Amino acid sequence: DVGEEFDGLWVGEVVDVGAMYLFIAFTLVINLNRWLTEKNSGLSKHNQLLLFISLSIFSIAVVALFKGTVGIILFAVLVIVSGHFESEIYRKYNKGLNYKPLILLIVFFGIAWGIWWLDITKTVCDQNNHFIQGHAIWHILNSFCFLFLYKYYKQISSINN
């Protein structure tokens, strides 16, 4: 049945994109809390968790309910807000962190994003190639972003303890 296949694809897309929103919601909550902590008003663990869950549910609901560019715009806004808090922390409260993992994250994400755009706009797209496609490269490169984020946040945890 075509309707069931379509629903399965839609669910797969929501799960696929949902992982991106979990990732960016995590960075946004962590960076917001770091920024607030520097201002002596950090969030409790409970409030961090509530904010993370709320952002995640809201973001994934937006993707599930709206097709098209709404989800892309929301993701971009969350990236910008998370990056804003990180840049404010760097600018005002620089604690001599090693920013190499964060820079590598940005580079890998930028390359992955560029490949994703080339794939989604069908600029570079071979639908007969079932071995590797732009979307697959997007996922592979983004998997390294998790490693780089871990390495970056691990040093912050070490400094704060």
Locations of the language-model features?
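Multi-pass alpha-helical transmembrane bundles in non-GPCR membrane proteins
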Residues: 1-161
